[in-house]
Amino acid sequence: MLMITSFANPRVAQAFVDYMATQGVILTIQQHNQSDVWLADESQAERVRAELARFLENPADPRYLAASWQAGHTGSGLHYRRYPFFAALRERAGPVTWVVMIACVVVFIAMQILGDQEVMLWLAWPFDPTLKFEFWRYFTHALMHFSLMHILFNLLWWWYLGGAVEKRLGSGKLIVITLISALLSGYVQQKFSGPWFGGLSGVVYALMGYVWLRGERDPQSGIYLQRGLIIFALIWIIAGWFDLFGMSMANGAHIAGLAVGLAMAFVDSLNARKRK
């Protein structure tokens, strides 16, 4: 048995299962915190993932509804709650995901009250040799954000990717990815621009790389990122490198973070294969 993906909404999961049944592929749903979709015939995994990518692009396509009618599951027979916004956040995010989100919000509020420079004096990458033993600085630069759009964009991705890693692989794995990527992406960025930078984007890019490659090489890990999203990440890096949008971007942190995530995913998936 191979787990293909998970859906928060069991009706959506049932729609995909019904459609694959019309294609001659039998999937099953197991209800845990979410609706986990499992495949018995692992030889069909690549085909199922390709169909899943198309399904996720437009789950409301009439062909999927038609498949549910054909299978007789338009009512799904499943009972599920309608989650309000904060309940949906809580459903996907583990404790580490929440702690980092709250820390970023608290730091952002402090920056609005005290000013960016005052907070950066305490949290920025060491900007003076006398500060090199203030070890928190090698990580806390990731908590600082300089605009509402900056923090919303990063926290949305952090919640989506970090939450998935924590739920599937544990809090320890998320902590390791976060600390290593914050340290190395910060080191590279300060070589590019000096110590005055901030943001969680280096960690977010590490999570993008990790989730995508781990899902490709080790589907049984239960994490997955559409190829379209990793292509978007690469386009965003290129746009930032050539300053196509006229915005200040931490290009060094983005590239380093992505490289860290890919490297960690390669090692972890290699170890997972050896254990089989």
UniProtKB/Swiss-Prot annotation:
GO biological-process terms attached to the record: proteolysis
Subcellular location(s) of the protein: Cell inner membrane
Record's bilayer topology term: Multi-pass membrane protein
Catalytic activities: Cleaves type-1 transmembrane domains using a catalytic dyad composed of serine and histidine that are contributed by different transmembrane domains
The organism's place on the tree of life at top rank: Bacteria
Class of this enzyme: hydrolase
TM spans (from-to): 94-114, 142-162, 169-189, 192-212, 229-249, 250-270
Gene Ontology terms for molecular function: serine-type endopeptidase activity
Documented EC number(s): 3.4.21.105
Function as written in the Swiss-Prot or TrEMBL entry: Rhomboid-type serine protease that catalyzes intramembrane proteolysis.
The protein, known as: Rhomboid protease GlpG
Gene name in the database record: glpG
